[in-house]
Amino acid sequence: MKNLIKGRYQGILVTGTDTGIGKTHVATMLAKTFLATGITHVGVFKPIETGVTGVPADALKLKESAECCEEVNIVAPYTFKEPVAPWIAAKKENRPISFDVIEKTYNYIGEKHDVIIVETAGGLFVPISEQGNYADLAKRLNLPILVVVGLRLGAINHALLTIQAARSLGLEVLGYVLNEFETDDSPGAITVEEALREFSGVPFLGKIAHNEFSIEKGREILDKVLDLTAA
């Protein structure tokens, strides 16, 4: 097992300010970038994916971007049909989610890979089960947090709440990535970057333009994360 992130983490938890704001987009870009830097064993993990009627789309994108050998049902061990929070989806299908199963799967992936990119379903405090939420899971798996901020009106509050709550629980926040997931040039969206630089207290890792997907942008983000090893 290698700890490539700050010398003490094998994985990164990619979470966000909301659902549908580009977490998978950022996670797949990072996976591709790790490969481009010569790290050939990149693991990906989305413990729970909801809104699945066939193959879990996000898990498949993650698997393909990392060129990993795990089957999709390992990348996403829990899938549910309804596009709702994991805890609710699991209750509706009477299939409880176990943190033990998630941890065992994470460790299995970790034995075969140098780094693991883990993606949440929704935000950091979305309930997974009676055992807790993604913040609890991050603590259990010893994962630092990368926050994807969807650039739109209201994102300042969502981002600051996520960052400050994570830090109050003792989680390390590596920084945040701004993602223009919509073509929104409203004053509210434009001021998000300025406000977060002033008040977030964590590093700004990069800004992704609408529909942008490039190794260059991924490297810009990843270099800042890996540069933290000297901190």
What residue ranges belong to the model's regions?
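C-terminal lobe/tail of nucleotide-utilizing enzymes
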Residues: K2-K6, Q164-A231
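Phosphate-binding/switch loop-helix module in NTP-utilizing enzymes
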Residues: P86-I128, A135
